[in-house]
Regions:
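His/Asp/Glu-rich metal-coordinating catalytic cores
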Residues: 2-75, 80-239
Length: 239
């Protein structure tokens, strides 16, 4: 990246997509708040036919591992591979804390259990718990998605408030976890958001995203009709 030293500028706020914008997967972002940096997510992308023999790719972590950029922390929004799957490839080089909620940690910790003391790099926090640094603070804001306990991130900075949505959809009856809580977003409205960094996957589709729980009655009817073995396939991120 050219002018990487701009990220150490103590006068301005910067947002950099290392991966995840203009593509599906590879979510990896960097915020710089007057010279204090924080990384959001560290995902993988699934390779397509243009890369024969390659299964996955990861955004280049050079910017925050091998340059003059020294992040204060990494924050994980949820446990899907396109947001956390890259960590295992450079986990040993991370020398800053990784913040996430309990479910996300419980789901991904198996990736690192062969590394002695891996848990010391993680800091488990609650939703709405404020974590403060010199030039910014943040809170995890619960939302709904196709995995339990996903979150967005609300940043409070010296120059304004930023909301990073993470992956989300409005699900009033999720298979697991709490339903989408409109009150949480009313609170964000009251705080005033100066900048929104938002997930836009399928935003151009003019339809309502239905809840996965709507499949339950159909599955029940089908299973009652069958007497033999039943094999059900599902998307790889389903739990």
């Amino acid at each position: 990246m050219k002018n990487i030293e701009l990220l150490n500028n103590k006068k301005n706020t910067y947002f950099l997509s290392i991966g995840g914008i203009g593509e599906i997967g590879g979510n990896n972002y960097l915020y710089s708040f007057k010279g204090e940096q924080v990384i959001v997510d560290g995902g993988i992308s699934f390779a397509d036919d243009s890369l024969p023999g390659v299964d996955i790719t990861i955004p280049d972590p050079y910017i925050f591992l091998n340059s003059n950029i020294k992040p204060k922390a990494m924050i994980l929004t949820h446990a899907h591979e396109d947001h956390v799957g890259g960590l295992e490839y450079y986990f040993d080089k991370i020398d800053f804390p990784i913040y996430c909620n309990q479910f996300t940690f419980s789901y991904i910790k198996h990736k690192f259990n062969k590394i002695a003391g891996y848990e010391k790099k993680f800091i488990i926090i609650d939703n709405f718990q404020e974590i403060e640094f010199e030039n910014f603070s943040f809170q995890l804001i619960p939302t709904t998605h196709s995995i339990p306990d996903p979150t967005g991130i609300f940043f409070t900075t010296l120059e304004g408030n930023i909301y990073h949505t993470g992956d989300w959809k409005i699900d009033k009856n999720p298979v697991t976890g709490s339903p989408f809580d409109y009150q949480n977003y009313q609170l964000l409205k009251d705080e005033k958001i100066d900048l929104l960094i938002g997930d836009s996957t399928n935003a151009g589709v003019n339809e309502i995203s239905r809840s996965e729980s709507e499949l339950d009655p159909s599955f029940g009817k089908l299973f009652k009709k069958l007497n033999g073995r039943i094999v059900v396939t599902c998307f790889s991120s389903n739990i």
